[in-house]
Amino acid sequence: MKITVIGAGSWGTALALHFSQHGNRVSLWTRNADQVRQMQEARENKRGLPGFSFPETLEVCADLAEALKDSGLVLIVTSVAGLRSSAELLKQYGAGHLPVLAACKGFEQDTGLLTFQVLKEVLPDNKKIGVLSGPSFAQELAKQLPCAVVLASENQEWIEELVPQLNTTVMRLYGSTDVIGVAVGGSVKNVMAIATGLSDGLEYGLNARAALVTRGLAEITRLASAMGAQPKTMMGLAGIGDLILTCTGALSRNRRVGLGLAEGKELHQVLVEIGHVSEGVSTIEEVFNTACKYQIDMPITQTLLQLIRKEMTPQQVVERLMERSARFE
């Protein structure tokens, strides 16, 4: 199958590498013309994922029309902020009918829409829209280390066809029709990872980390259920699986945000040092707004938002959470 990957960050590049190494032709496209030239010349993404050479089956395209030609699937792997404009480009290039998966995680700012909802709004006639989510770091996938992720869509028949087509010995795919649950789990875990990094950076220990991960899962489950998801989805790869990896993994950008804030650094400085998008930061406010809309209590999210707004110190965030009134779990 010909697969088009839009977005050449670390995750987009890792997916392009993976699928091109497992029987697919892949076209990788990004808006950044300088980055396209660099990748074409070096046959490597030295900016987004250095150290991994591109196989012959991976084509880097400067022309989106060429990248979309004969494609059977489009993966949009931009930041969430770039998702809508990428979907608009599909329409503009006459490719709005192609099957499309959002492989980014978060809520769209201002609208509060999940990624698949953005795609449905831009491409209302497309019946093959879904998300790819689950516990997976780009570096490990590029090294061909095993992982398991979820493909979710409201279109069950399509997912049943797509999963065996994309399944490999390195990336085990599971299908789901609970696209809300999969999308919410992948989005809100980024917020919880910042909180866990904050606690670890303050050296509050493993007990505190376990408490944050567990209560974070409770917050995610409450919100997802209120939005129409199946609670059991939060017990799977897109829920607790992604949460554990992002909260504890050394490669987690969102965890690194929390660690940086615990050192007393300004948020801007932390993000510059990381050098990549941290969706958790841009997601916090939309998650909190959505929780308010559904009247869901999300104390970890709320206190983190106050930290980002400089209304609290890192120490006060943890103190506030521990001072909450006693209750049954």
Curated annotation (Swiss-Prot):
GO terms for molecular function: glycerol-3-phosphate dehydrogenase [NAD(P)+] activity; NAD binding. It is found in: Cytoplasm. Its main location: cytoplasm. Its EC number is 1.1.1.94. Keywords: Cytoplasm, Lipid biosynthesis, Lipid metabolism, NAD, NADP, Nucleotide-binding, Oxidoreductase, Phospholipid biosynthesis, Phospholipid metabolism. Disulfide bonds: none annotated. Gene3D superfamilies: N-(1-d-carboxylethyl)-l-norvaline Dehydrogenase, domain 2 (1.10.1040.10), NAD(P)-binding Rossmann-like Domain (3.40.50.720). Pathway: Membrane lipid metabolism; glycerophospholipid metabolism. InterPro entries: 6-PGluconate_DH-like_C_sf (IPR008927), 6PGD_dom2 (IPR013328), G3P_DH_NAD-dep (IPR006168), G3P_DH_NAD-dep_C (IPR006109), G3P_DH_NAD-dep_N (IPR011128), NAD(P)-bd_dom_sf (IPR036291). Sn-glycerol 3-phosphate binds at residues 105, 134, 136, 189, 242, 252-254. The keyword Transferase does not apply. One of its GO terms (biological process) is glycerol-3-phosphate catabolic process. GO terms for cellular component: cytosol. The active site is at residue 189. It catalyses: sn-glycerol 3-phosphate + NAD(+) = dihydroxyacetone phosphate + NADH + H(+); sn-glycerol 3-phosphate + NADP(+) = dihydroxyacetone phosphate + NADPH + H(+). NADPH binds at residues 10-11, 31, 105, 138, 253, 277, 279. Belongs to the NAD-dependent glycerol-3-phosphate dehydrogenase family. PANTHER family: GLYCEROL-3-PHOSPHATE DEHYDROGENASE (PTHR11728), GLYCEROL-3-PHOSPHATE DEHYDROGENASE [NAD(+)] 2, CHLOROPLASTIC (PTHR11728:SF1). Catalyzes the reduction of the glycolytic intermediate dihydroxyacetone phosphate (DHAP) to sn-glycerol 3-phosphate (G3P), the key precursor for phospholipid synthesis. This is Glycerol-3-phosphate dehydrogenase [NAD(P)+]. It comes from Neisseria gonorrhoeae (strain ATCC 700825 / FA 1090). The gene is gpsA.
